[in-house]
């Protein structure tokens, strides 16, 4: 069956934003105007089409990126809803991989918030072209031009308004389209903003519109020499020329076109859809995705064409109560049909494709075939996890793996009834398959099950899902911080492991140099053995011994990180040497060496942003200092003080309750992991004591 929508009319977009910038409402309206949902759902009432997990309905925040398909002016738009809460950055990162473009939603009052910065950095990392939608223009304190300034200053992006607002707050009537130079005015009486009229620009805004049109044209002609000459020669540019220049500059990530509106009041959504089609790229207009041939290690580029061999990336696994495991996949090239076989190149296993589903946020449509450039769900894959590549076995390819951050917080969980132990283990295993930033381990000493993740909320939601989806009630322990250890001085250490007790002995002898590395560098092992003083086959054993010892720590049992080991000398015995002996020698040399190298404990430091009314500022800052925090900057935003600080994670437990009581419920905060830093010695002593206790 030939494809219905040609490739150049497909858009794969994400809608990314800070919590409460109105992202779900915006998505909801897009689905409404494109005719998928007939009744608009409001997040406040918990009925939005995209937010379909129960907890999301309660908390009003979007947790899982559901992929939804809709149509606008004959174009197929696949929307990946990305979570805005900072504990779910992993989901945002994952959806960035598979997008071709994004709509960044900003709140007209709040502007650029810390999570917007995190999401923006991720979009830069994957080179995702984006357009900005300034939402909530009807709110008190809405200021489009302030948001433009913040995008330039805080996100260092070249924000170019292609619309300016007509009025603001209660008087927000519509927008001026700077490309057509027309006013678009919504009729408040019409059903849910479905009608708007093109009118002449109001006299009092004419001058401002002309000034912003000049700025817009100057920003975009820079990317096109022929247009630049025409423009500076004083000739008028046509609407088509301006549009194609905006598109070119957007795809090259040289500009971020800015639009505005209020999704809640249904104003500005249709022009946003037009902008998605006009300015964001089709799958064949972005750089080809690259992969590696698993056999030769050579790089291969994937041409987004139906005639090429099939290749796709599994970017999300979800368990559905009716059909079982859904594997959301971005199809990069070729076609895939239900009932066929594909190769999971990451695992090197064949998989049978069961059914293929196109998702409309909560309804699903079964299809026989998916084409290149599309996004959809596969039912029936057994071994595929997030980040795996599916491909044609005739052309195996591994598309780049995504890198997932290590968890910073963990808590012990146990089922309320012993009978649920196995049920809990199976459920946690399933959740870990869905979410690579969530880990499950067993504490060897206590036998407890430990779950680790990206923040308190992340783990709360996991425990919540155990209860709702898997019917396992759990008790949780006190949250534990993921401390690390490292050392500050370079040392050399010798260790000879020799055992002689009748029969065959054990002999391994090594000299290692331990060198501290800068934060984030990780572990490196360098083999400097000359002349075979340690035979080749024993060298990996030394490396393994050191890595295992590093995992167990030296001071308080936390993993030792960021160091380099040079193995530079040693000796062996023809009969008595073995891998085991060298592994033990490596491990003991490491432990003894680190003790002399000035070892320290590192703790995760969070970047915290707090917004409070001015009268509470003194208390809040005093409290940050008590928590060993450092205030980094303060600014005024519409009479609210915005405090940026770095605070150790261990001091932030239960902060939301404390902040509420300090500010009578008027303060809000958000935090994101930033870096690791050395713990002051008095606190390090306490941590060591507690661990040895």
UniProtKB/Swiss-Prot annotation:
Question: Which sites bind GTP?
Answer: 17-24, 81-85, 135-138
Q: Which GO terms describe its biological process?
A: ribosome disassembly
Q: Which GO terms describe its molecular function?
A: GTP binding; GTPase activity; translation elongation factor activity
Q: Which domain of life is it from?
A: Bacteria
Q: Which Gene3D superfamilies match?
A: 3.30.230.10, 3.30.70.240, Elongation Factor G (Translational Gtpase), domain 3 (3.30.70.870), P-loop containing nucleotide triphosphate hydrolases (3.40.50.300), Translation factors (2.40.30.10)
Annotated ranges, domain tr-type G? 8-284
Q: Give the protein name, as stated in the record.
A: Elongation factor G
Biological source species: Nautilia profundicola (strain ATCC BAA-1463 / DSM 18972 / AmH)
């Amino acid at each position: 069956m030939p494809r219905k929508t040609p490739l150049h009319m497909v858009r794969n977009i994400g809608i990314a934003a800070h919590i409460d910038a109105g992202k779900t409402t915006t998505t909801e309206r897009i689905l409404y105007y494109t005719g998928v949902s007939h009744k608009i759902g409001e997040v406040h009432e918990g009925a939005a089409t995209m937010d379909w997990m129960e907890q999301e309905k309660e908390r009003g925040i979007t947790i899982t990126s559901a992929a939804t398909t809709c149509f606008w002016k004959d174009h197929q738009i696949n929307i990946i809803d990305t979570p805005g809460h900072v504990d779910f950055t992993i989901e945002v990162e994952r959806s960035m991989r598979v997008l071709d473009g994004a709509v960044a939603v900003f709140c007209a009052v709040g502007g650029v918030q810390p999570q917007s910065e995190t999401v923006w950095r991720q979009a830069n990392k994957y080179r995702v072209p984006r357009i900005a939608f300034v939402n909530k223009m009807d709110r008190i304190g809405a200021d489009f031009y302030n948001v433009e300034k913040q995008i330039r200053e805080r996100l260092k992006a070249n924000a170019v308004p292609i619309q300016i607002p007509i009025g603001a707050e209660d008087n927000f009537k519509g927008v001026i389209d700077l490309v057509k130079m027309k006013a678009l005015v919504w009729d408040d009486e019409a059903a849910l903003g479905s009608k708007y009229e093109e009118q002449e620009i109001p006299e009092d805004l004419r001058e401002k519109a002309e000034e912003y049109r000049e700025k817009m044209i100057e920003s975009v002609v820079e990317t096109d020499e022929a247009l630049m000459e025409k423009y500076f020669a004083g000739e008028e540019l046509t609407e088509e020329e301006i549009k194609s220049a905006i598109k070119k500059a957007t795809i090259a990530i040289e500009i971020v076109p800015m639009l505005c509106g209020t999704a809640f009041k249904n104003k500005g959504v249709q022009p946003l859809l037009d902008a998605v089609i006009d300015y964001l790229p089709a799958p064949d207009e972005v750089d080809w995705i690259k992969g590696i041939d698993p056999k030769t290690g050579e790089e291969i580029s994937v041409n987004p064409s139906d005639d090429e061999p099939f290749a796709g990336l599994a970017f999300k696994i979800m368990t559905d109560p009716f059909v079982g495991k859904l594997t959301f996949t971005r199809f990069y090239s070729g076609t895939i049909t239900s009932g066929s076989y594909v190769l999971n190149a990451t695992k090197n296993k064949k998989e049978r494709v069961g059914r293929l589903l196109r998702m409309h946020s909560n309804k699903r449509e079964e299809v026989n075939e998916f084409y290149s450039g599309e996004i959809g769900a596969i039912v029936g894959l057994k071994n595929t996890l997030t980040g795996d590549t599916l491909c044609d076995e005739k052309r195996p390819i591994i598309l780049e793996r995504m890198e997932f951050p290590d968890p910073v917080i963990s808590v012990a969980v146990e089922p309320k009834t012993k009978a649920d132990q196995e049920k809990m283990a199976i459920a946690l295993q399933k959740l870990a398959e869905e979410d690579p930033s969530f880990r499950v381990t067993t504490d060897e000493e206590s036998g407890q099950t430990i779950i680790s993740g990206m923040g308190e909320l992340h783990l709360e939601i996991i425990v919540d899902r155990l209860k709702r989806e898997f019917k396992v009630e759990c008790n949780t322990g006190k949250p534990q911080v993921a401390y690390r250890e490292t050392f500050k001085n370079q040392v050399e250490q010798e260790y000879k492991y020799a055992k002689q007790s009748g029969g065959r002995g054990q002999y391994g002898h090594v000299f290692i140099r331990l060198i501290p590395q800068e934060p984030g560098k990780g572990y490196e092992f360098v083999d400097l053995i000359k002349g075979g003083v340690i035979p080749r086959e024993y060298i990996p054993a030394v490396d393994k011994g050191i890595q295992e010892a590093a995992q167990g720590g030296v001071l308080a049992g936390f993993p030792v990180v960021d160091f380099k080991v040079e193995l530079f000398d040693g000796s062996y015995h023809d009969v008595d040497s073995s891998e085991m002996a060298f592994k033990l020698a490596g491990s003991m040399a490491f432990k003894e060496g680190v003790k002399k190298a000035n070892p320290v404990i590192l703790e995760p430091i969070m970047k915290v942003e707090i917004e409070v009314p001015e009268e509470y500022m003194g208390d809040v800052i005093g409290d940050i200092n008590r928590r060993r925090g450092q205030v980094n900057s303060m600014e005024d935003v519409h009479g609210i003080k915005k405090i940026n600080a770095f605070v150790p994670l261990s001091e932030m437990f239960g902060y939301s309750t404390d902040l509420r009581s300090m500010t009578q419920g008027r303060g809000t905060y958000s935090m994101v992991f930033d870096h690791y830093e050395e713990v002051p010695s008095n606190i390090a002593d306490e941590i060591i004591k507690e661990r040895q206790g």
